[in-house]
């Protein structure tokens, strides 16, 4: 979220329910700033945008009508398949959603975490699933990895 917002964040919280008018504590609306100047986030944001929209390992995260930014990652696992990671936010300017997905034993970032994150963003931003083939891909993934000896 800090990269998406170019240097600020809100205190994370979980809402169990909202009764009546908006009753969230005021501190959840307060921006907290890092010590990094916003201008330093621009090259990172641009790189994340290019990775999705120009070319790179994140192109599968493209979503028509939205400027999606993202970065795949692969965390090495000495005891089995690598872990799959994907960080993303959209739209590029004035983000509405930021997401991080980590799939243990999922392989490359683009293999497991990216499709999951992309589908969640798609549903959040459009209130529908436009890519049923991606949903089927996720359902068909075999990310189970049996227990290993210590």
Segment roles from a protein language model:
Residues 131-150:
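Short, highly charged C-terminal tails/helix-capping segments
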Residues 1-32, 39, 48-130:
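Active-site beta-strand/loop architecture of penicillin-binding DD-peptidases
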